[in-house]
Swiss-Prot record:
Organism: Vibrio atlanticus (strain LGP32) (Vibrio splendidus (strain Mel32))
Protein origin, superkingdom: Bacteria
GO biological process terms on file: protein catabolic process; proteolysis
Function of the protein: Involved in the modulation of the specificity of the ClpAP-mediated ATP-dependent protein degradation.
Similarity section: Belongs to the ClpS family.
This protein's name: ATP-dependent Clp protease adapter protein ClpS
Complexes and interactors: Binds to the N-terminal domain of the chaperone ClpA.
Length: 106
């Protein structure tokens, strides 16, 4: 009895796995929310320190927070966004300000 077997070349199953497309990571906006107690200068400091914004851009974002109630500080992967939110929250509490910082999926 003769049987015909088709032998796969070594590593051919790996090639198929490499062809599958990898989805880009989910991105998140880090958002600052307005309150009646946090000084504008402190918000600018946060934006410069944790989001590396220059003074002009930080002032623009701070004014958007002030007049519109919230503003996006930056867009990051989940882990980086979580870290930014934690850093801003901790720094705000250390300085006795109730500034709210959240993340929202894009």
């Amino acid at each position: 009895m003769s049987r015909n077997f088709e032998w796969a070349s070594p590593g051919s199953d790996l090639l198929e796995k490499e062809r599958t497309k990898v989805k880009p990571p989910a991105m998140y906006n880090v958002v600052l929310h307005n309150d009646d107690y946090t000084p504008m200068d402190f918000v600018i400091e946060i934006l410069e320190r944790f989001f590396s914004l220059d003074i002009e851009k930080a002032t623009e974002v701070m004014l958007k927070v002030h007049y519109e109630g919230k503003a996006i500080c930056g867009t990051y992967s989940a882990e980086i966004a979580e870290t930014k939110v934690a850093q801003v929250t901790m720094y705000s509490k250390e300085n006795e300000h109730p500034l709210l910082c959240t993340m929202e999926q894009v």
